[in-house]
Amino acid sequence: MYKYKIIFIILLLIICTSASKSEDIKNNIETLENYLNTIQNMSFTFEQLSPNKEKEIGWMQIEKPNKLRIEYKGTNDLIILSNSYYLILYKANDDIITSLANDGPWSILTKNNLKFGLDKNNLDTNGVVSNVKELKINKVNHIFYEILMRNQDKQLMPPIILHTSSNPFKINGWTIFNEKNEATKIKILKQLSFNKKSLNENIFKLSEQDRLKGDVWEGPFNKPQ
């Protein structure tokens, strides 16, 4: 009889622990949703570590919905722009434009009214949270979310791992993976603005006139015109 009591207590503890963990995950997902959905626009500098281990410093400006601009410090002449339809890659030195479908895990920063879930079969969500890990680093609670965002066809894309911390809740960076499972890591260095009341919409444009003049840079870096 004593043995069965012990087994019952152990099973009860496992069930309670599992229920508590499930509730923690739901709370963490809700916290992330609420934070991301408060973002209207945001700019920051970042450090990028590419699959080839090359480090670069960049600047990103986002505005919802679907607008993004990225520039890099130094000799890297790449400018990345996005709108509701296209992701535009512009090589300034050669004046070459490449347009791609604006479908990628970066949409976690640019979509409105994000909703995440745990069920891969629920097509009403923007993404599926496949894993959540909490770590205490220097007395600060860090939460890592592994999320599979959906593309425009509702298909799940390669994961983005979002690194956040609490008090106050903020995004510290993320890791994205290509089709070969190679990782590109982004670390936010400094937030420059958050929900600015007035934003120059020309930031997200690249006019032919500016291209001809070579006047294409909008970021904080001292780039040659």
Predicted segments, located by residue:
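N-terminal secretory signal peptides that target proteins for export/translocation
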Residues: 1-2
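A short, Trp-centered hydrophobic/proline-enriched beta-strand micro-motif
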Residues: 34-54
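Gly/Pro-enriched, hydrophobic low-complexity segments
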Residues: 117, 122-219
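Sec-dependent N-terminal signal peptides
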Residues: 5-15
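Solvent-exposed strand-loop boundary residues in beta-sheet-rich modules
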Residues: 50-52, 93-95, 180
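An acidic-aromatic
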Residues: 60-111
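Bacterial Sec-dependent signal peptides at the C-terminal "C-region" and cleavage site
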Residues: 15-24
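Short, solvent-exposed coil/turn segments at beta-strand boundaries
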Residues: 38, 61-67, 82-86, 164-171, ...
